[in-house]
C-alpha cells in the first residue's frame, strides 16, 4: 500500500529568496520530501514557496491551499492547488489534509495556524498528527505554555498528563531534525 503522507508547513509569506528564513524553509521542504512526505503549505510566497520549491527539487509532491480571499496566485512549485473560499476554510483545510505539521518563523498568521492546530491536538479534535517547530523563534511561546500547563497550581489532572499536553509540539533545531522527528512519530502511528 502506497499511502501518501502529507506534512503541512506553516510560515511567513515575507522571506525573499536570499533570506535565511527562505533558505531554511527550502531545506525543510527537501528534507521532508527525502523522508517520503508530500508537502502542503498555504501556497503563496515566502516560506510557502521555499518549502514547496525544496520539495519539488527533491522530486516530492506539493499541495498549496489557497483562498479566494487573497488576490494572489499560487507559487509555481505547487502541484495541486486546493482553492478555498475564505481564510478560515483555508486554515482548516491545511489542518485537515495534514498527517503532521511544522511551523517555521512567522508572524500573526503563522501564530494563528500553529495555535489552532496545537489546540485541536490538545483537545483531541485531531489525534496522531505530530507537530514540530523549527529553530528557536517559537521557543518563548512553547516555554510559556509549558509553564502555564505544568505550573504549581492545584489541579485534578496528573502532572504526567499536563506535561504530555504541554509537549505536543516538538522543538527541532534544524529542518533535518524536524523531518526525522515527524517520520519517526508517524511510523509509530
Regions found by a protein language model. Name each.
Residues 1-63:
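Glycine-rich beta-alpha loop segments
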Residues 18-20, 111-115:
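Glycine/threonine-rich flexible loop motifs
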Residues 23, 46-105, 109:
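Acidic/glycine-enriched connector segments
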Residues 45-50, 138-152:
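Glycine-rich, charge-decorated loop segments at or immediately adjacent to ligand/cofactor-binding or catalytic sites
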Residues 50-55, 113-124:
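Short Gly/Thr/Asp-enriched flexible loops that form oxyanion-binding sites at enzyme active sites
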Residues 64-68, 104, 120-145, 163-164:
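Short, acidic/small-residue loops that bind anionic groups at enzyme active sites
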Residues 73-76, 148-164:
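Short, conserved catalytic or adaptor-binding loops enriched in Gly and charged residues
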Residues 100, 156-189:
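A charged, well-structured terminal subsegment
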Amino acid at each position: 500500500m502506497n499511502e501518501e503522507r502529507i506534512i503541512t508547513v506553516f510560515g511567513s509569506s515575507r522571506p525573499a529568496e536570499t533570506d535565511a528564513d527562505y533558505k531554511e524553509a527550502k531545506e525543510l521542504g527537501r528534507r521532508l520530501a527525502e523522508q517520503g512526505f508530500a508537502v502542503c503549505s498555504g501556497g503563496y510566497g515566502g516560506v510557502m514557496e521555499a518549502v514547496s520549491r525544496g520539495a519539488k527539487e527533491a522530486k516530492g509532491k506539493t499541495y498549496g491551499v489557497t483562498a479566494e480571499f487573497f488576490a494572489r496566485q499560487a507559487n509555481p512549485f505547487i502541484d495541486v492547488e486546493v482553492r478555498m473560499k475564505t481564510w478560515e476554510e483555508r486554515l482548516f483545510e491545511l489542518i485537515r489534509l495534514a498527517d503532521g505539521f511544522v511551523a517555521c518563523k512567522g508572524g500573526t498568521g503563522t501564530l494563528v495556524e500553529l495555535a489552532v492546530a496545537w489546540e485541536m491536538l490538545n483537545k483531541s479534535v485531531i489525534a496522531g498528527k505530530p507537530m514540530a517547530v523549527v529553530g528557536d523563534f517559537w521557543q518563548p511561546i512553547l516555554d510559556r505554555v509549558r509553564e502555564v500547563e505544568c505550573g504549581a497550581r492545584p489541579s485534578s489532572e496528573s502532572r504526567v498528563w499536563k506535561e504530555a499536553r504541554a509537549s505536543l509540539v516538538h522543538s527541532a533545531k534544524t529542518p533535518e531534525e524536524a523531518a526525522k522527528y515527524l517520520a519517526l512519530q508517524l511510523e509509530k502511528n
